[in-house]
Amino acid sequence: MRTIDLDKKYLWHPFTQMKGWLENEQTVITAAKGIKLIDEEGREYYDGVSSLWVNIHGHQHPHIDKAIIAQLGKVAHSTALGLANVPASK
């Protein structure tokens, strides 16, 4: 089964009109580098919204990736609801 078929069968996309999503062919992103997203056909798109603001320095930034990999060896996520954590405090 194609990725988009699995997506349409099992995923809900918030802030998306699902009727239109399900009726039309959609772009599937398979990779990203710097400020560009890459689809299944190898076409490149500018990530104009920085993947909703979480990638303002681009995808696969070496300094950021190194810090993420180091942090994953400690704790992947902890809530800020009543707890503090070292990386956020720095």
Briefly describe each language-model feature range.
Residues M1-A31, S50, V75:
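Active-site-adjacent loop/helix segments that line or gate small-molecule/cofactor pockets in enzymes
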Residues T3-D5, A31-D39, I56-H63, N85-P87:
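Short, functional N-terminal and low-complexity linear motifs
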Residues K19, E23, L37, Y45, ...:
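Residues in flexible loops and secondary-structure boundaries
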